[in-house]
Amino acid sequence: GGEFKLGIIPTIMPTLLPMFLKTFIKKYPKVKLKIEELTTEEIIQRINDGHLDAAIAATPLKIENIKERVLFYEPFVGYIPANHRLKNKKTIEVSDLDINDMLLLEDGHCFRDGVLNLCKTLNKADDESFQLESGSIEMLVKLANEGMGMTLLPYLNTLDLKEKEQHNLHFFAPPSPAREVSLIYNKNELKIQIIN
């Protein structure tokens, strides 16, 4: 019995939660699962303060007292609208990306950091007059559909797209850039049985 407090980052919450919630409830019917959507920064703080038992986040974080157990690697997928310069490419390469025509999540989202790190390797200048950052992946897709640029999506977020929007997905040629998603918890965590 008891309570288990789990934090999940916003870009993972809507896709992963429905997949594992029923299984958890069946396996631990006496445990009250309390789930919070938090940024990575908030998660780290709350794990260190003892206010969270575990979290699901993009890793590696490499934080001394936090243990990371990799759950899966989630590929990035290009979302390229019909009016974009890359629309006719069957597969895309990291070298095709230009930070100046990309729609990004706002600061504080680790998925944004992953995309920026990908683009940094290209050393492209950031001198465009228009730059937009949004708090939601759904908004990035809507803005791309309006011709405001392209975006990258975590693979699990592509599964809920409408059929019409699925046509705008362009996968990377191997090796595909991906994010590591892990279960993270304090090394001294006492609820290790549930974590396992």
Where are these regions (language model features)?
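Secondary-structure junction motif
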Residues: D101-N123, Y155, K191-I192
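Short beta-strand-to-loop elements that line the ligand-binding cleft
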Residues: K32-T39, A58-T59, A125-S136
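Short beta-strand->loop
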Residues: K67-V77, S129, T151, Y155-T158, ...
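A late-sequence structural motif
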Residues: L16, N168-N196
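Flexible hinge/capping segments at coil-to-helix
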Residues: N65-M102
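Short beta-strand-centered segments that line the small-molecule binding cleft or hinge
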Residues: M19-T23, T40-F76, I80, L140, ...
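Short beta-strand and adjacent tight-turn residues that come in two discontinuous sequence segments
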Residues: L38, L52-A58, G135, L152-P154, ...
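N-terminal winged-helix
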Residues: G2-Y28, K32-E37, E41-Q45, G114, ...
